Amino acid sequence: VHNIGHAARIIAYGDADVMVAGGAEKASTPLGVGGFGAARALSTRNDNPQAASRPWDKERDGFVLGDGAGMLVLEEYEHAKKRGAKIYAELVGFGMSSDAYHMTSPPENGAGAALAMANALRDAGIEASQIGYVNAHGTSTPAGDKAEAQAVKTIFGEAASRVLVSST
């Protein structure tokens, strides 16, 4: 996600008209599986993999490890219109944070996630009331779920229960 945000800023600053951005991760290595297993962060519901990862569920027991990659082509709006491109979405803001709280657990108050959301809202020049959906990390771990839920409550206040939240 950081690469996408940085690519959008490069375009916004006028340093490029088009950028390809994204990333890849391969965590399902012996070291990755062993580390997450030792941290008790992996779901043990191997008998029902479709329901194993359940962020924010009271019966959650961890996440399902997977690998993935994704790439996007970002293009300056007028440049895209000029060439007749089909425009799928507009990235209006980007935010990030890094709190270095703990190697695997966020602070309970979700300060880092709340700061990233606040930074994205500020960058976009919009209010939290204009947001209807949050794509969260959703690790299905007690510490991660609690921190993310608190971050959403911090940013959206009383409206937090009306904002749709899911995870990748």
Segments predicted by a language model, with ranges:
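Conserved beta-ketoacyl condensing-enzyme motif
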Residues: I10, A24-G35, A128-K146
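Conserved catalytic cysteine-centered active-site region
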Residues: V1-H6, D15, A38-V64, Q150-T168
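Active-site-proximal alpha-helical scaffold in enzymes
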Residues: V1-E25, V64-A85
